[in-house]
Structure formats: structure tokens, C-alpha cells
Swiss-Prot record:
Biological processes, Gene Ontology terms: autophagy; endoplasmic reticulum membrane organization; endoplasmic reticulum tubular network membrane organization; macroautophagy; nucleophagy; positive regulation of autophagosome assembly; reticulophagy
Database matches in InterPro entries: TB2_DP1_HVA22
Species, as recorded: Schizosaccharomyces pombe (strain 972 / ATCC 24843) (Fission yeast)
A Pfam family hit: TB2_DP1_HVA22
Transmembrane segments: 9-29, 54-74, 103-125, 135-157
Protein name per UniProt: Uncharacterized membrane protein C30D10.09c
Primary residence: endoplasmic reticulum
Amino acid sequence: MQLLMLEQISLASSVVATTVLVAPVLSTIINLLTNFGQRIFIAADSSKSTSMEFLSTIIGAGYPIYKTYLLLELPSKRSQLLPKAFQLRNEEHKSIEEERRRLMAYWCVYGCVTAAESILGRFLSWVPFYSTSKIVFWLWLLNPRTQGAAFIYASYISPFLSDHKAAINNFLEKLVQFTTRQPLVLNAWALVKSLIDKLPKGDVEAPGSDADTKKSK
């Protein structure tokens, strides 16, 4: 009986000793697997976020740039090159001007969003599904059926600028007066102006002039 008890005690001691030796190894393996899994998840999430940001840039900036190009330079070919969902319904000059106004309203909204992102970029990056939501937002702004850009411009941007127009003009006047009194600023502006004067100059007619009419014929 005593021999059996001694064997059980010895076996238990061996198990405990083995556990003590193996536990750190198992803990290390588990930590390595956990860290590896976290890195894979972070890499996958980062790759997905990068892809969504790229798609957001294509929709939010790439397409409007191309659309602006078509409306300014190729009015006769826009119906062939624009997707059907974004085509003008008729070829009247009034419709072209309305489409240009909607596009200018879009660029105003886009500028506001870009300015907000430059300030709140670090915080917005932590918002779940931010890139996906931004894609939906761009589509809502651009779609001629929803006319989201025109709505935001008329409802928020235009009233805000109208209410603060005097303050903005006053600030700009003071800024000009301040900068014109600073020799360093004047010298810097003279340098910038000299560099601008050295850039190539084109001889083109303004968008919306007779050149558009000639191209559309």
C-alpha cells in the first residue's frame, strides 16, 4: 500500500515538474501565434483600408476631374464618354451650364471635406467603415438624381459664406495690408512672381466661350 502511494506521489511530482518546464514554452508559442495573427489581421485591415481609399480617390477626385475635362473641352463627346447614369438628358446650352454649376458646387463641397480631413485625419482614420462611407458620400454628391453637392452647397456652404462675407472680406483686406508692409513677404512674393512669369503661357479661350460652341458642332 505504501509502495503504491509512493508511486502515485512520484508520478504526480513528475507531472508537476513537466508542467513547470513545458508551461513557459507553451506560453511563448501562444504569444508568438497571437502576435503573428494580430500582424496578419492588421496587415489585411491596412490593405483593405488602402484599397478603399484608392477607390474613394478614384470616385471622389478622378471621375470629377475627368467630367470637368469633358464639360470644359469636349462638350460634343460627353454623351459618348460619360456613363449613362451621369449623362445629360439633352444637348441644350442651358443644361451644360447647369451641369457646370453642379460640378462647381461639388468642388466646393470636396474642398470643405478635404480641409476637414487635413485637420481631423488622425481621428477619422479610427472611424469604422470611414472609407466605405466616404465612397457612398461621393456617389451621393455626384449623382444627378440626388444632387447631393448642390443640396449641401445651397443649404450650408452658400448661407454660411453669405452670413460671414463681410468678416471674410475684412480679414482678407487686413491680411493684404499686413503682408504689403512686410519686406520679407514682399521679397518672397516678388520671387514667386518672377518664377511664375518664367512658366510657359498658353493662348487659350476661356471655358464657355465660342470655342465650346465650335467644338460642339
